[in-house]
Regions:
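Hydrophobic alpha-helical segments typical of transmembrane helices
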Residues: 19, 56-59, 72, 81, ...
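A generic structural signal for well-ordered alpha-helical segments
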Residues: 23-24, 86, 112, 144
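Residue-level "edge-of-site" marker
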Residues: 37, 99, 157
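Generic preference for hydrophobic
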Residues: 33, 47, 70-71, 177-179
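Non-catalytic C-terminal accessory region of glycerolipid acyltransferases
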Residues: 103-216
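A short beta-turn/loop motif at secondary-structure boundaries
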Residues: 36-41, 169-170
Length: 216
């Protein structure tokens, strides 16, 4: 895993992606992907996904087919195995308790989002305990506006049934990854960030069951 540290794109393709697929296979978790045609080859995007389970990570890593950097909470850096692997892959840790430090980290991370490498956010900030789509935070949308990059909304379903909240029980099941058409930020001012965020949330919610679309 760490021998690929000098090239994080190669590391992701040849270590992280197979790892995610093997984890899904042994669960087992069947995966279906819709909307792959909405991914433009060579385009860097700000990827925005709902967050239902720890298994979202395997689903996105294993089946999205995009080179990306995660934006993740600083606390994960100290988790044995996970922290050092994510650092080797060039992922982005932010200190959510320090707003200015978080902004500075995102600012320095911009250099990584080039040449088809994207950045992915869970804008709810944490997993939804009840499956309902939570309110979004603005970080992903501010970065998209600042870098003038399209937002690629993604809906994840089924993973919370494979690994339910509050347990370590893995259950055989099915998951779906829905990739929506990109949302352009062209002509959108920073003052309209809230509207951009609300519109993106509506797109992601549209592929969830009606009972899970309201803020949990």
């Amino acid at each position: 895993f760490l021998s690929f540290v000098s090239n994080t794109r190669v590391s992701s393709k040849w270590a992280a992606v197979p790892w995610a697929r093997v984890m899904a296979m042994v669960t087992p978790m069947r995966v279906r992907v819709e909307g792959r045609e909405n991914i433009e080859t060579g385009q860097s995007d700000v990827l925005v996904s709902n967050h239902q389970s720890q298994y979202d990570i395997f689903l996105l890593y294993g089946w999205l087919g995009v080179d990306f950097k995660w934006v993740m909470k600083q606390e994960l850096r100290s988790v044995p195995g996970i922290g050092i692997a994510c650092e080797a892959l060039g992922h982005i840790f932010i200190d959510r308790s320090n707003h200015q430090a978080a902004l500075a980290t995102l600012e320095s991370a911009k250099a990584k989002i080039v040449d088809g490498t994207s950045v992915i956010f869970f804008p709810e900030g944490t997993r939804s305990r009840d499956g309902k789509l939570k309110r979004f935070k603005k970080g992903a949308f501010r970065m998209a506006l600042d870098l003038d990059l399209p937002i690629l909304p993604i809906t994840v379903t089924g993973t919370r049934d494979v690994l339910p909240a509050g347990t370590s029980d893995l259950l055989p099941g099915s998951a779906k990854l829905i990739i929506h058409p990109p949302v352009s930020v062209e002509g959108i001012s920073a003052e309209a960030c809230q509207r951009l965020m609300d519109e993106t949330r509506e797109v992601i919610a549209s592929s969830l069951p009606a009972k899970l679309r309201s803020a949990g």
